[in-house]
Amino acid sequence: VSVRCIEPDNAAYPTALKQYRYSTVLPTLKAIAHPAALGLSQLPKLALFGSSQCEPELVTASVNLAQQLQEVGVCTIGGFHTPVEKACWTALMAGTQPMLYCPARSIDTLKLTQAQQTAIAQQRLMILSPFPPSQKRMTAALAGKRNQLVAALAEALLILHAKPGSKTEALVKTAIAWGKPCWTIPHPSHGHLLQLGVRSLPTLPNSTLLF
């Protein structure tokens, strides 16, 4: 599978990045996807974000919700890097619904797992990155930029967990300012998110209501 370059003037370039500007310069995107699946980036997408430190009961609730998302076919997007995000990734990859994976590094030399290769061949997985070949290793700075990209690309956000004053909370504020729906799992530690305007998601509604 080859790495494709998607310039801002390309018809396959996500229109959301032109509307929700997190950078003064529109990034050139690199994509790994089946040739017939380049349109995955234009689907309505739910972004998943979860802090590195997440209580066990929240991880369980997040995985249960991820299983529901894959069962109803919601297209998800994220970096899937923190433990709770990785747990959701495993649940989501077990389905057949579309997914977008955005690592916080260049994908020019990215080694794909067998599961990723299979999902790409099935035209359900696209891997996207705005980073040049020189940025081969993930850093905190790149992760921050990646998260901004994911939030800009998504139609709605699902906050699995975010601590007060965290970078994830700051991202939520940006998304709400953009007018994007933000959801979170009901939990006593999420009161600050509800005060920001994040909505509680006790059960998965009709998937169209997420957006």
Q: What residues fall within each predicted segment?
A:
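Glycine-biased, small-residue-rich flexible motifs in mid-sequence functional cores and linkers
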Residues: V3-F211
